[in-house]
């Protein structure tokens, strides 16, 4: 595998309805359709990114491009937003999904799991193997996907900064739980008022909020402007409130059943999944591939370390890919 290239990367962008919810999909590579209808030219493997929260696909734009190049442009790399976390551009045609029934609560944590499973069922052939790369709460969603759909041909699941247990008890969770569970509605009016600002002013506000970072991915700034939408922020905060209440006990049974397929990557200063969570899971699963970050990467690595993370993942998966 070669290092990340600066050459142009084919990137396809689409907005669809999945389970009745607006969904943003970014696809790296020439493959736009991986359904069974085009089985003759299908790749053997799909890399699918399950985002954190906020689950906007645009945050992972640089990451999937870097990963695609690091994989020698041999495999498609897709990222699927969480249901309702995207604001479709005005005038952009939405592709209606008529084959999948609407979920009762697609914006909640359970609904987001079913949303990803339904997306795969509709858009990816069963013959294609999967590498699931999950970030933050996406790791919880990925473990649930593997639990509920054992028929998925998952070659590997890479769980980055995994929030898979005791979220409300984490340092950040203790601060955010009261806000998310009791006071989140108070944020809607300020967001509504800010939504009327010109796009340039919104971008300036985002830059100001991220001013403490030495370098910040430009696509992260552009994507963050979407947070000035009441619909998006309501769905983001609602999902986050459910995370605090529902992500309590680690699903050690599912981890044990899939241990050989899993790679865990914990941070050293992560206030959402502190290092003692790493110490405990490492003790419980001594034979697991459970790593501790030695590079000082932040939980929200997509803000400034997408290329570095992509390079590490391609190195981790080198042996698996040579066996295909």
Curated annotation (Swiss-Prot):
Q: Which GO terms describe its molecular function?
A: sterol ester esterase activity
**One Pfam family it belongs to:** LIDHydrolase
Reaction(s) the record says it catalyses: a cholesterol ester + H2O = cholesterol + a fatty acid + H(+)
- This protein's source sits in the domain of life called Eukaryota
Q: Under what name is this protein listed?
A: Lipid droplet-associated hydrolase
What's in the keyword line of the UniProt record? Answer: Endoplasmic reticulum, Hydrolase, Lipid droplet
Q: What function does this protein fulfil? A: Probable serine lipid hydrolase associated with lipid droplets. Has low cholesterol esterase activity. Appears to lack triglyceride lipase activity. Involved in cholesterol and triglyceride homeostasis; stimulates cellular triglyceride accumulation and cellular cholesterol release.
EC number(s) given by UniProt: 3.1.1.13
Q: Does the keyword Hydrolase apply?
A: yes
Cysteine disulfide partners in this protein:
none
Residue positions of the active site: 136, 270, 299
Question: In Gene Ontology terms, what is a biological process of this protein?
Answer: intracellular triglyceride homeostasis
Top EC class of this enzyme? hydrolase
- Source organism (scientific name): Gallus gallus
Family statement: Belongs to the AB hydrolase superfamily. LDAH family.
Subcellular localization? Lipid droplet; Endoplasmic reticulum
Q: Which GO terms describe its cellular component?
A: endoplasmic reticulum; lipid droplet
- The yes or no answer to whether the keyword Hydrolase is present is yes
């Amino acid at each position: 595998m070669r290092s990340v290239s600066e050459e142009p990367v084919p990137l396809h962008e689409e907005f669809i309805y999945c389970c009745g919810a607006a969904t943003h999909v970014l696809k790296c590579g020439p493959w736009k359709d991986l359904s069974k209808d085009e089985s003759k030219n299908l790749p053997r493997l799909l890399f699918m990114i399950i985002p954190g929260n906020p689950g906007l696909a645009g945050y992972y734009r640089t990451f999937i491009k870097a990963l695609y190049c690091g994989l020698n442009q041999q495999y498609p790399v897709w990222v699927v937003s969480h249901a309702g976390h995207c604001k479709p551009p005005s005038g952009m045609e939405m592709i209606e999904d008529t084959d999948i029934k609407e979920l009762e609560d697609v914006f909640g944590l359970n609904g987001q799991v079913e949303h990803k499973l339904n997306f795969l069922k509709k858009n990816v052939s069963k013959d294609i193997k999967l590498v699931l790369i999950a970030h933050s709460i996406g790791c919880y969603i990925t473990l649930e996907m593997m639990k509920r759909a054992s028929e998925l041909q998952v070659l590997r699941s890479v769980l980055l900064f995994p929030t898979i247990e005791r979220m409300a008890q984490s340092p950040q969770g203790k601060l955010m739980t009261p806000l998310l569970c009791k006071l989140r509605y108070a944020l809607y009016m300020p967001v509504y008022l800010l939504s009327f600002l010109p796009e340039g002013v919104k971008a300036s506000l985002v830059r100001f909020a991220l001013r403490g970072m030495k370098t910040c991915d430009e696509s992260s700034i552009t994507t963050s402007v979407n947070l000035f939408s009441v619909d998006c922020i309501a769905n983001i905060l609602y999902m986050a409130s459910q995370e605090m209440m529902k992500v309590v006990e680690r699903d050690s049974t599912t981890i044990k059943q899939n241990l050989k397929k899993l790679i865990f990557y914990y941070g050293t200063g992560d206030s959402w999944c502190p290092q003692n969570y790493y110490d405990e899971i490492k003790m419980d699963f001594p034979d697991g591939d459970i790593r501790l970050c030695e590079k000082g990467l932040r939980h929200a690595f997509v803000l400034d370390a997408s290329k570095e993370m992509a390079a590490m993942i391609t190195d981790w998966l080198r042996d698996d890919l040579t066996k295909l």
